[in-house]
Amino acid sequence: MFYDILVYGFIQSAALILMAFGFSLVYGVSRLPNFAHGAIYVFTGFIAWALFNTVGLPYWLSVLLSILASGGIGVLIYYVILRRVRGMEVSEVIATYAIGLVFLEGLRYAGFRGGTYTLPVASDGVSFIFDVPVDHQRVLLMILGFAMVALIWLLTKYTRMGRALKGMAQDERAAMMLGIDSDATAAVAVALGSMLAGVAALIIFPLGSLVVEEGYKVLIYAIAVCVVGGLGSWAGTVIAAFVLGYSQYMTVAYGKPHFQMVVMLLAIIATLIVRPSGFFGKQKQLEERV
Amino acid sequence: MSTHHTKEPILEIRSLSKHFGGVKAVDDVSLTVNRGDVVGIIGPNGSGKTTLINCITGFLKPTKGTVSFHGKDITGKKPHKIADMGINRTFQIMRPYFSMPAYKNLVIPLSSPRAKRVGGWRGGGKHGDRDTVAVDILEELGFERDSRVPYKMAGTLPTGYLKRLELGRCLALRPELIICDEVFSGLSASEISSLVPLIEKLNGQGITMIMIEHRLAELFRVANRVMALSYGEKVTEGEPDEVINHPKVREAYLGSEEDF
Amino acid sequence: MTTETTQKRRERIDRGIKVRSESLYALNSFEEIAYLLTPRVLLIAAFVLMPLILSPWPYWGRVGLSVCILALLSISFDFLANYVGLVSLGGAFFYGVGGYMAAVLNTELGLPPVLSIPVATLLGAGFCTLALLPCLPLRGIYFAIVTLMYPLLMTRIIEAFDILGGTEGFRGIDGFSGFFTEQYGLILAMFIALFGLRRFVNMDGGLVIRAVKDNDQSVRASGISVTRTKAKAVFLASLTGCFAGAYYIHMYSNVGISSFALDLSIMPIAATIIGGAGTLVGPVLGAAILVPLSEFLRDFGSLRIVVYALVLTGFVVFRSEGLMNYMTRKYQQVERWVKI
């Protein structure tokens, strides 16, 4: 039982990292709350499904194209919507949330509901970790979860674009004075964040079925992880994902699965009340309250 | 120049420190302000003057030390509680309500619990009267009553009027102690020379004042005691003449001697 | 400047009649009185006549009432967002709390609607204010996020602990005695909320609340507690929202977790932004547009939400002033292009 919790809690945490990292990245770099995050997550899943099943492309190509598509959607959302309301936080939230609704409810209207749509798993095999059986999709999830964090970290450290992103995150004005295009960088950030959401969808969806409701759930999970970890703090996001991942798995193991969401919602509310800058963030308190 | 020297301390600051991480913005500063005093606080930029004020008025919590008002410990109390006790401040970066007319800016402090309790303005606290009282106060501060100035949006007023509006907010609260954070800065010489008599008048009405200033010449016309800060520490304190001749103060202000 | 292109700028000038009717002299001529009163009279007349016109079609009567319900929720949102500076994404919280409170009062304690609605409004507003009290120091996006979570948490708690009727909710709640009671009760309440709040924001107490939005540091320096001021404002907003919820459940005789549904948080925002933020009347106008629209789209299921969301996004991004501010400008000012 102990190893069960250890392993599956770890998997749950890795899934949360995947779900939240894109949201955290976008907010961290350009201070843009992308509330369409969950919608992009679901939408990418459906694109992959449609390319694979309706168009009949090979699965690897469908995956690749759908991830590119999610990046494209991110760029579009930035240039059509976010750029015009940038700086007005509340408008950003409302506009991105509304666009997310358009995607999700549009899919629902188009008839995607219920448990009929599934994505194939990468492999059917099962491995044993500490004698706990884990299917290969979940192994992949763990590996990719951390690979992505490592990749983004390397990106920000060693590429020009990555350094521009990092510079923007620290001080937008100073970065602009050094010749970094604020719009382009923010668009890249939103695109990267959306692609991360897409990758997460393509790894996590095969474990269950494609449903529109996942979009709302993922958004709340992403917000929970980012708020508890400190909005915009990447290290905080990872730590918070573990705290929340394990506590979620514990509620499933010992209580009712119903409480999974309650845990997340309470975590958001409690964190914002007690320490709005998050438990692992390094942002100044003064920014969000006096 | 103030002539009240009853030596009744109303504000006592004892070894106050405020550290931001490793930076000692204010370090072990003590100061006693007596009733009727006009105390000037001088020092180069970054010497901790505004931080000190923020600690006194509750906008920041001091790391160490105490502040007491009328012998009552007020360290770390909430800003509105301290304002309610009669310590009122102006902001260096003026903070009017830009979307309201100038006189409505004063209706806010006139609606505060302190204004209702202490009252004393002609007309008192009833609704409708506050507008009149607000215009009265503005007139006292040099807003011409019959001009349109008191009724203009605060956002459209020039700096000189905004500074007066900051003072007006303090006056509306019937303060015992006004702390001015650089009221003279950013003003022209003629604007300053019209503000100086106003400060003297308020002091004459029995209001104790602490003034942070860079404009030493004007400050020394009104202040009866001066404290000099440098890097968060108190350099010296005393009569204006003593302070200005203190070698460390001269050193800190070297290069700006034309001010004296 | 030596460029050949002539530049133009749009100049706006107050109409003569607007300036004349600003002061007491407006009473000089009927034309000016009419100019001043027409918009108000039109609004009031529309709502007073609505039940009389719609009485042969009870279904559309209910739609008319839905306009009022949404208008109340939107007024509550507009007041909080644009007069206090607290953008709440959780309007459904007020609505649901009011609804459940009235349901319990009516079914468990047997209070008739005449009592259960006002009591639920007051108790509900008290509950909401207490629940939001710890969040009041939060600003901007942080307050928005936390309020978005409150109604979601309520549904999950009701589901998980199976309290307050669980997923089923309450049924068999008393309805109103007659069509016109139901209609005019709500319309009257909407007018009270609308004109009451409009008056309040211009009184000294309302001014203090607006000052908090403008500059809370100055309010603190004026010896006024910002948290207490915000709490008062939240209480007023939750009164409005809770009343809407309490009234609605008596209209339909049941309440369920759908009272905390997301639509109820999104629709008021859409109505406010479309109608014109910061006007309090705008939200009523927005509601009067959105509710009938949603009736026509009823057969299209979730396409309804897609249409709302698109319209909402369009307004947020391209026409953020909303209809009311646009119309006011056209009514009061002439525009022309001037060469510069």
Task: Tell me the role of every PLM-derived stretch.
Chain B
Residues 174:
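Conserved catalytic motifs of ABC-family nucleotide-binding domains
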Residues 65-72, 85, 138, 151:
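Conserved ABC transporter NBD signature motif
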Residues 219-221:
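A short, surface-exposed alpha-helical micro-motif characterized by mixed small hydrophobic
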Residues 42-44:
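The feature captures the beta-strand-to-loop junction immediately N-terminal to the Walker
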Residues 57:
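Helix-to-loop junction immediately C-terminal to a conserved catalytic motif
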Residues 178-181:
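Catalytic Walker B motif of ABC-type/P-loop ATPase nucleotide-binding domains
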